[in-house]
UniProtKB/Swiss-Prot annotation:
SUBUNIT field: Heterodimer of a B chain and an A chain linked by two disulfide bonds.
Keywords on record: Carbohydrate metabolism, Disulfide bond, Glucose metabolism, Hormone, Secreted
SUPFAM superfamilies with a match to the protein in the record: Insulin-like
Designated name of the protein: Insulin
Amino acid sequence: SALTGAGGTHLCGSHLVEALYVVCGDRGFFYTPSKTGIVEQCCHRKCSIYDMENYCN
């Protein structure tokens, strides 16, 4: 899986949403593509599982 390790990976669009489902699980997450936060961090640059956890509810 692209999520292994903390080195980081590029995740965009549906791949990013899917990764958030995996990382956040039952907690859920907030994903607002209009706000650049997670897209900027994970799509334009690289982010890790630990970065994504910041977007869980």
